[in-house]
Amino acid sequence: MRIGIFIDDYLPSVHGVATSTTNLKEALEALGHEVYVIAPRSKTYEDDDDHIIRVPSAKNYVFDKRETGVIYPGLARRLDKYEFDIVHSQMQFYVGVLAHSVAKRQNIPHVTTVHTLYTELIDDYPLMVTAGIIALTAALPIALRTRPILPTPSREQLRTMSKDAIKETFSHQGWRLTAAFANKCDACISPSNHLARILIEEGGLTAPCYVHPNGIDTKRYRVADPSDSPIKKNPGEKFIISVARLSPEKRQKALIEAMPHIPDQSIKLVLTGGGPYEQELRMRAEELDVSQR
C-alpha cells in the first residue's frame, strides 16, 4: 500500500509521537509498503529521506516556538499526485485536519492515533494547552463540517473560576474536541486501554477504537554490553530508574525532590533520557545536594 502518515510536529523535535511515527514508518516499509510522512517544514533541519513531505509552516510563539503547519485551500490538492491508499494522522491539529481533507478528496480511509493525555499537560503547559483548546474550539467544527463543540468559557467566567474548575472545564473540552476529530475518521487507535476509555466516556468517541501499544525495537538493546554502562552498582545499592524524555510532564523533578526524604544513602536515582528539562533538573539536584545520588 501507499500510506500517508500526517503529524503536526516531527523531526528535529524529540518526543514520543515523533519517535513512534519514525518506528511505524520503518516497520511498514520493512513489510513492503510505500510510506510518506507529511509534517510541517523545519527551518533548521534537512531531511535525508525523499519520502518525508514538508508542508508550509510558521513559528508559533504560544506553542513553545515550534513550527506549526500552515494549512490553506489547495494544499490537499497538491497531495493528489501521491494517490495514497490510506492516511494515518498521528495528531489531531492542523496537519491532522489536512489528513482529513486528503482522505475526503481521494475517497480513502483515514485512521487516527490519539497518543497523548493532552489534558494532563494543563498543569505544566497551561498557556499552550488552553490556547490550543480555544483555537480548536473555533476552527475544528468548520474544518470538519460538524456542529459547534461546547462553548469555551468567556473571559469574565474564567476570572471567577477556581484553578481546578478551569482545569476540569478545559479537560472536558479537550476530550470532546479530540473525540470529535476521531469520530470523523474510519477508525481510532489508542496506545492504552486507559486512554481509550477516556475517549469513549469523556469525549463521546463512537468511531471504532482499537488498543495498540506503541512498539519498541528491542534489537537496539540486545547488543548492549553491561560493562559499558556509565552506572556502576556497588554491593547493596538499590536504583530507582526513570527512562523518559526529560520534560516537565514526566515528573522527574518530583523524583529528585523526594530524594532528600529517603535517609537510606544506598538508594540511588537514575534519570535516563534527554530533553529540554535537563539543565533545570541538574540545577535542582545541586540545590538539594542530591546530585551524587
Placement of each model-derived feature along the sequence:
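Membrane-proximal helix-turn-helix segments that form the acceptor-binding/catalytic region
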Residues: 105, 137-187
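Nucleotide-sugar donor-binding and catalytic loop/hinge architecture
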Residues: 1, 224-239
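Conserved donor-binding/catalytic core segment of Leloir-type glycosyltransferases
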Residues: 189, 232-259, 270
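Carbohydrate-associated surface elements
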Residues: 41, 194, 215
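An amphipathic, basic-hydrophobic alpha-helix
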Residues: 61-89, 94-101, 105, 172-176
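N-terminal subdomain of nucleotide-sugar transferases
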Residues: 1-56, 82
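Nucleotide-activated donor-binding/catalytic signature segment of Leloir-type glycosyltransferases, i.e.
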Residues: 279-293
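Acidic anion/phosphate-binding donor-loop and adjacent secondary structure
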Residues: 200, 216-230
